[in-house]
Regions:
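Gly/Ala-rich phosphate-binding loop of Rossmann-like dinucleotide-binding domains
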Residues: 49, 53-54
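Conserved acidic E/D residue at the C-terminus of a beta-strand in Rossmann-like folds
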Residues: 56-67, 71-72
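Conserved N-terminal Rossmann-fold NAD(P)-binding element of oxidoreductases
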Residues: 38-40
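Glycine/serine-rich phosphate-binding loop and adjoining beta1-alpha1 elements at the start
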Residues: 1-35
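Short glycine-/small-residue-rich Rossmann-like dinucleotide-binding loops
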Residues: 121-122, 150
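Rossmann-fold NAD(P)-binding glycine/threonine-rich loop
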Residues: 127-176
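Conserved N-terminal Rossmann-fold NAD(P) cofactor-binding segment
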Residues: 67-115, 125-130
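N-terminal Rossmann-fold NAD(P) dinucleotide-binding loop
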Residues: 45-46
Length: 176
């Protein structure tokens, strides 16, 4: 039937799109991501850390400006893990692994070997530009700075960067 042909066409087109990297040059390959840094332990930063530790199973270094903020972020992550444990969607062992993947810090210790830093602080251009400069000072030259901004132009945030080509936008919409 025509409907069946259209449904099959949609299926094959969707499958083909999943395989498309968006880069025409086959010599260009993605770099591996082994460790993530997250700036800001608020609701968004903690949610990004939780999703990264649980779904991607990557270690996350979570930084905030004060211990109270870090503790709130870690408590939020723990509540999310506990909820999954209660629903038996993960085991106690898996819950422990997820919790251990997120390590807190008040400074940039542990950021020297992260592949991507995701910034999840409030919408303040000068703050985000300062964070770009700090990340470049404490991380590898290849580290990607991914801003989670929803309203500021990425180009303006990248103006403070020594390596603006490493500044990207990566918006999470309610990660949990």
């Amino acid at each position: 039937t025509p409907q069946a042909r259209q449904l099959m066409s949609i299926y094959f087109a969707t499958t083909a799109l999943k395989k498309d990297s968006g880069v025409a040059d086959p010599a260009v390959q993605p770099r591996p991501v082994r460790k993530i840094g997250v700036l800001g332990a608020g609701l968004m930063g903690a949610g990004i850390s939780y999703v990264t530790a649980g779904k991607a199973q990557l270690p996350v270094r979570l930084k905030d400006q004060d211990a109270a903020g870090l503790n709130r972020g870690l408590a939020y992550i723990d509540r999310l893990v506990q909820k999954r444990l209660y629903r038996r969607s993960i085991t106690a062992f898996e819950a422990g692994q997820e919790r251990r993947r997120v390590t807190p810090t008040l400074d940039f210790s542990g950021f020297q070997n992260v592949d991507v830093v995701i910034e999840a602080v409030f919408e303040d251009l000068m703050l985000k530009q300062r964070l770009v400069a700090e990340v470049e000072a404490h991380c590898l030259p290849t580290t990607i700075f991914a801003t989670n901004t929803s309203s500021l132009p990425i180009a303006q945030i990248a103006e403070a960067a020594q390596r603006p080509e490493n500044v990207i936008g990566m918006h999470y919409f309610s990660p949990v």
